[in-house]
């Protein structure tokens, strides 16, 4: 760590501790009575239980940076997807671009604002089932929020308990499972109108049926959402070309044969179909894009999991097995560079040139663990896991009439078209068969020296393996045979974790934490690029240091939290782009991220509530970085996908009158950032993002079991740029959805 970084970190730590002391003085003076004698208070803030440490505990007791958005909070703000809520948590930026490739960045740990070429830096889980397969992630899951119990956001590396890809942090979707104690049902319908778009709608339903009371139950969820397009594609002559439809559901079966045994089955199916890409070309106008072909994106996720929880008394045993299948198919317009193919290959292509890209994966995971009962002086956890995946990735370039064009080429001649483009269109393709494995032994122990002081020590011994066999066919190998290459990487290591917490009262906790994270190295699949690229990237790792405090005061009506962190990142995996717009991965250099996260929750009475968070961070290169084909990004350059400042506010007021009218105002601010490291090279045109404010307003009234909500999103119609990418047809900007008004009806049994 550099001396300057030391000084900045120490200043941040002092500020965090000062904030904690300011909150702790009144908390000690007003210590609450024991829980068993305390009278319930409607003004107390909600107590949220999380499983961040793979055991249930209050979010206020976790010696780490954990936030949780409850199912009720998701409903209150009308959240449908990650874009609606994830940035409300400290230290998190959502780089929205296209379904399946939009990317969550935690604490600035990223080298691209999108999910391109390799394993990401944020882990995704559904009820603790990993959704990031080893190596390249086919689809970044964005699970519909209907009937979720909560979404847990773990900031900082989670490699000890959650494995690879959780370098920056993890997101754990917690879905409600079947409840055998009674019948339940819910229905929700939404109609909305977005500027420059058709009318949107959504319909969702849930039913929970106890087959045998307290023994066996089934819960089913179904949803459909149509988000109409708001971009006009002048090349296609289509208004609102970027229509997106999301459909799917979940199924849960829970069997509790006795009080010590629980079997839980959970299935997820979700399909997202986007008719066209969601980036605009600002040089052409406000909400305008221009392509010769529709750039569709189709994604499918299927997951089945079976979980056994067995209470032995002296320990709890958990076995969690899963099977998942993902598929993603894209199309990109390459027509603007058709002229170069015609010139270099003596072709006369006149139809649009396109790239088809995507893949599918099948993954299987198993985790076994023993956990001691909570509340003892020594708590421990021991576990083992295994995850393997088989993937097929493809990249193919084509155009209608390609076979005929090659037959007419002086470089290839008659008869070549049938060999080069057997389907008549695809004339160069690159296929990769990838197998990935991850296995690990992990454990964690917490010892309470006194009721106030606790020490936690943990570690993960892991081994990873990736094998890839790639095949290239088309004009680049003609007249020879297809070119087949194979490569394999094996890596192993150990991730430690140490934390120390001090809880002088029920209302105050201080903690210090050191943890590590890692992710797989990956081979490159940009086989169609005309430029030479590295064969792939090796694994990278980081170390996270943080100090934090959680304080509760004013008899439980106010919570103030502060965290200071410093992340040291080495051998960083870079996500870069060739001059002909293909993404590739390599390793290089060092980086750091340091910052302060502040959050507050205040509920002075049972009518008003204010939730707020402020994050300051600096995620920067720690040394000069040479970028192939681009130049050198100097030390101190900003890391992509991050912002130095983010501010979030949620104010809610419930009027004390008939129908309980409730008014909720939310605000988000995100400072400027860049979308890729190529932008950091002096003289390059920066791909910028961020620097916007968003305001949403909701008004809800309750009529018995039915809530009716009127809402307005992006009230100022801000063109907040969430990601910028250099496309062949111009600089493309992903933007937040334009101003939207609508109404939602929610009925609960």
Task: Describe these PLM feature segments.
Residues 1-79, 83-88, 208, 259, ...:
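N-terminal Sec signal peptide and the immediately downstream disordered periplasmic leader
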Residues 31, 373, 380-381, 448, ...:
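Gram-negative outer-membrane beta-barrel transporters
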Residues 94, 103-157:
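Periplasmic plug
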Residues 119-121, 132-134, 145-150, 155, ...:
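Outer-membrane beta-barrel translocator/receptor signature
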Residues 195-274, 300-305, 361-362, 366, ...:
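Transmembrane beta-barrel wall of Gram-negative outer-membrane proteins
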Residues 204, 307-334, 503, 509-517, ...:
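Membrane-embedded beta-barrel scaffold of Gram-negative outer-membrane proteins
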Residues 254-259, 268, 370-373, 385-387, ...:
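Structural signature of Gram-negative outer-membrane beta-barrels, strongest in the C-terminal barrel
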Residues 668-678, 700-749:
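C-terminal beta-signal and adjacent terminal beta-strands/loops
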């Amino acid at each position: 760590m550099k001396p300057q970084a030391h000084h900045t970190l120490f200043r941040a730590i002092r500020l965090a501790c000062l904030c904690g002391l300011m909150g702790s003085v009144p908390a000690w003076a007003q210590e609450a009575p024991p829980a068993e004698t305390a009278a319930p208070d409607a003004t107390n803030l909600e107590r949220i239980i999380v499983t961040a440490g793979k055991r249930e505990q209050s979010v206020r007791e976790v010696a780490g940076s954990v936030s949780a958005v409850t199912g009720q909070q998701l409903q209150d703000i009308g959240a449908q997807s990650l874009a609606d809520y994830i940035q409300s948590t400290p230290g998190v930026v959502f780089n929205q671009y296209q379904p399946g490739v939009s990317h969550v960045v935690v604490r600035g740990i990223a080298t691209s604002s999108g999910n391109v070429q390799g394993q990401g830096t944020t882990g995704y889980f559904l009820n603790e089932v990993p959704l990031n397969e080893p190596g390249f992630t086919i689809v970044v899951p964005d699970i519909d929020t209907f009937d979720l119990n909560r979404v847990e956001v773990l900031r900082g590396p989670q490699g000890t308990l959650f494995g690879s890809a959780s370098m920056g942090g993890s997101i754990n979707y917690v879905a409600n499972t079947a409840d055998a104690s009674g019948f339940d049902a819910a229905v929700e319908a939404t109609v909305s109108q977005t500027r420059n778009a058709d009318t949107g709608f959504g319909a969702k339903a849930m039913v929970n049926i106890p087959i045998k009371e307290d023994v066996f139950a089934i819960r089913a969820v179904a949803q459909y959402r149509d988000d109409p397009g708001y971009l006009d594609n002048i090349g296609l002559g289509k208004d609102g070309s970027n229509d997106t439809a999301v459909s799917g559901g979940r199924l849960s079966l829970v069997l509790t044969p006795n009080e010590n045994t629980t079997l839980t089955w959970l299935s997820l199916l979700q399909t997202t179909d986007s008719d066209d890409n969601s980036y605009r070309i600002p040089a052409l106008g406000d909400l305008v894009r221009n392509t010769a072909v529709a750039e569709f994106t189709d994604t499918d996720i299927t997951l089945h999991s079976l979980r056994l929880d067995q209470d032995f008394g002296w320990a709890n045993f958990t076995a969690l097995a899963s099977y998942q299948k993902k598929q993603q198919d894209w199309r990109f317009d390459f027509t603007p560079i058709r002229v170069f193919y015609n010139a270099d290959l003596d072709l006369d292509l006149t139809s649009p040139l396109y790239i088809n890209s995507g893949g599918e994966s099948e993954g299987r995971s198993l985790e076994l663990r023993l956990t001691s009962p909570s509340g003892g002086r020594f708590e421990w956890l021991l576990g083992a896991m295994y995850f393997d995946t088989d993937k097929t990735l493809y990249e193919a370039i084509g155009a209608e009439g390609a076979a005929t064009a090659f037959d007419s080429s002086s470089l290839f001649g008659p008869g070549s078209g049938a060999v080069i483009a057997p389907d008549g269109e695809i004339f160069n393709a690159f296929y990769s068969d990838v197998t990935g494995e991850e296995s690990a032994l992990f454990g964690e122990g917490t010892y309470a020296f006194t009721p106030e002081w606790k020490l936690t020590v943990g570690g993960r011994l892991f081994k990873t393996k990736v094998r890839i066999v790639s095949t290239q066919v088309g004009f680049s190998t003609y007249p020879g045979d297809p070119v087949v290459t194979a490569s394999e990487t094996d890596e192993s290591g150990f991730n430690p974790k140490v934390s120390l917490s001090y809880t002088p009262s029920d209302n105050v906790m201080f903690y210090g934490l050191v943890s590590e994270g890692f992710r797989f190295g990956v081979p490159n699949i940009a086989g169609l690029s005309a430029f030479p690229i590295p064969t792939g990237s090796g694994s990278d790792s980081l170390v996270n240091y943080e100090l934090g405090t959680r304080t509760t005061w004013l008899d439980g009506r106010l919570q103030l939290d502060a965290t200071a962190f410093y992340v040291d990142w080495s051998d960083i995996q870079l996500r870069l782009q060739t001059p002909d717009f293909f993404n590739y991965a390599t390793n290089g250099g060092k980086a750091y991220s340091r910052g302060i996260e502040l959050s507050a929750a205040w509920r002075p009475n049972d009518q008003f509530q204010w939730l707020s968070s402020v994050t300051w961070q600096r995620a920067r290169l720690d040394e000069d970085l040479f970028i192939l084909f681009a130049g050198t990004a100097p030390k101190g350059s900003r890391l992509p996908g991050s912002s130095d400042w983010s501010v979030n506010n949620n104010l809610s007021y419930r009027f004390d009158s008939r129908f309980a009218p409730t008014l909720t105002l939310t605000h988000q601010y995100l400072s400027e950032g860049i979308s890729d490291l190529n932008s950091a090279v002096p003289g390059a045109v920066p791909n910028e993002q961020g620097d916007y404010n968003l305001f949403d307003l909701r008004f809800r009234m309750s009529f018995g079991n039915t809530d009716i909500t009127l809402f307005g999103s992006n009230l100022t119609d801000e063109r907040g740029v969430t990601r910028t990418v250099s496309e062949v047809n111009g600089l493309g900007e992903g933007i937040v959805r334009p101003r939207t008004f609508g109404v939602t009806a929610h009925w609960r049994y």
